[in-house]
Amino acid sequence: MKRLQLFGRSKYFSLVSSAAKEEEEEEEGCADAKSLLHSTSHDIKSRSLRFNDKSSLMCLPTKVLLLILRTLDFNTLVTLCQVNSRFYNLITNEFLFQNVILDSKLSLLKFNALIHSEFHTSNIVTHSGDCSTQSRSQNARFLVRSIEFKNPQSQDSLLKYSKFYNKSGQDSIIAGSYKLDSYDKDVKKLNNIRLNDETPIITSERIKLLDKLESNYFHYTYIELMLDIIDYLPNLTRVILSDVEPNFKIPLWYSVFNDGSRDFFKKIIKGQQSITNEDLRTFQLSKKFVKEYESKYYSLPRLKILEIKANNKRQRTFNRQRHHQKLVLRPSLFCCFGIINELKLENVTIDTESLDTPMEFLPLFLKNEDNELYSLQSPITALTLDSCDVVPGNGILRLFHSYFKMVKHLSLLKINSKFDLLLCSCFPSLSNLTIDCNSKCFTNEQVVGESYYFQQRSLDTEDDFDDCNSMTETLFEAPSDSKIITPPPTSSVVLSLNLNYISRTTGNDVSNNPSPDNNKKPAMLTAAQLQNFQRQRIPEFHSFYHYYRLLWERLPSKNISINVINIPFTNVYPLSPLSFWEHLARTITSVDETDEDVGDENDQETLIGYENNSIRDNIPNANAVPNLSTVMSPESDIHHTYYWNNSVRRCLRDSLIKLKNRTIEYRDLDVEEFLQNVTLENFFNDFQDPENFKDIPNINLWCFLRNLSKFKAVKIRMLRHFSLCTPRTRYDWELLLKPVLRVNVPIEVRDKDGFVLYSYGQK
């Protein structure tokens, strides 16, 4: 009863008599006296039981406990530090100091003073009572593995090293910089909080030491504080610059090649150009210069990972000035970090000036191509481009090839343009390629209306109007040109297009196209077809793959492992050409037999049809789309010959010949006679019939997987988590990945969380 009084007295206990209450109070008083006598022994027993209980969380192995703690947020981890010494030891040594985020210049100053004071983690929970749970004190600067600088500033650095400065003490500063006056206010606020705090955690000596160190670094600029922090963290492997503004710049004064010599300062003050890769082709380097440069290069600090994430908030607001608002990559952005092994760029624009090679400011590898010929290469071995724009033209691909010769791992994430796949051929040492298949350039392709495939009629002359007005006296609507002017999006045409029987540039080919003025792209999906695929939850990547198939086939594949990420396989399966043509041949045969039995039952149908939703007025709509199922029917008198029909027939003939040689069932099949006796125009060109285009995603998936089979190894990461993926057995995965497994390529499939769903041939 006494423990329930912590929540207050309830009005429902008023029914108990006062005498009974007094008796209960006397009993509770005796119990309290007894509990005071045994308090010490009770604490010891409870403490021993707490740590000896095998069912408690603390008895879990350290690896398991770390996995559990890794799922918690930062605030929860800070709260758990006060539970006991083991939690404090694990959290401080494994989580709190591993990934540091600094969001202001004041936070940089505080953290810089903290690590220079040789701060050690200590046990907050005093006298835990068990030697096995005592915290191990470690130096905080040795625990930091990653550090992030949010919204880095460069105005104070530009002001410090500019010849214009504030002489009169005014707030306006020349040279495009501004004065940071919020520092003193932040310091006063922090001091007030520190003085008013009733439970100080650190001692007064520690506070005095931190204040002294802060005063020593008070006049440092933002970039100087950043570099000083990086230099004082020996185990640092990752540096992140996030929310970088487009006007952010790092002056060349902070280059790692700045040795304090007068020659280096003269180059910057006079604006002298550094030696570049182009200069090495015209000038001869002395052996002394090469030896001195190599000694400087190999003595530079090394950084494993550098990430630069541009701030894209302004880009969404000012769409008209999007190109000017985006952060443009310049060599000065990473000239102060030393030799970088892995570079990750996000929302950054890359142009020809981004790949400049100033070897006297930027650490570049000087490679001896020949006895007297040298070339400059970036030391980066892993490159990640996330939502980056590559400005085309001016030999950008050639510069990529010469600049990133040492890159072995390339990752293209959230690709903005499908033509960025051409960059994959610009890395001579490439061995591992990662492509994001859920990028907008693969899922948001252009779709057209059905009128795209027909010749538009214009009613310009009076005779046309008279003819159309006279049509109202009959039961027929105005006739429209039902001839298709470009290869339509049917399964047969898309398959012939993917197998190179039809060229995507046939619009300009006089030999294949009788009307070369027609520059329309073939097999463009219509809006109705895309809606049909979306209702079936078919991924857009497989629906549009024939749009960019040529770009995927141009990817380098020799001795290269590919990692395909964010790709779904919902409601699709690989349909091989032989299976498709075999099914189509059976369908054509069954349709012909049915037509012979039906006879003349459909004589009452009209020869010309229109869409049901077309407007039927006295003056017909010139953009009305013909109903191809009626126009291309065997009873129709309208027959058109298309230049792509022969290409589709050749694709069908070659597949039937292969099928005849492989299958006993079709050995007696006369291929030429079969092609002459059947009518194929309806199956080839009627893109309005769902039966004629339903297999486009399945055909595209087969071509996509067949293209992946050319690589050394294939790794696939699904778009969704395991619980949201289509449940498949190992046999189902083998059927899905059959085009890849036929060539014995090692393949591995994981879900979004990294759980292995299928593996074959992996070591």
From Swiss-Prot:
Protein's cellular compartments: Cytoplasm
Disruption phenotype annotation: Stabilizes the adenosylphosphosulfate kinase MET14 which leads to accumulation H(2)S and SO(2).
GO BP annotation list: protein catabolic process; protein ubiquitination; regulation of sulfur amino acid metabolic process
Taxonomy, superkingdom: Eukaryota
GO cellular component, one term: cytoplasm
Keywords: Cytoplasm, Phosphoprotein, Ubl conjugation pathway
More about this protein: Present with 432 molecules/cell in log phase SD medium.
Protein name: F-box protein SKP2
Species this chain originates from: Saccharomyces cerevisiae (strain ATCC 204508 / S288c)
Species lineage: Eukaryota, Fungi, Dikarya, Ascomycota, Saccharomycotina
Gene: SKP2
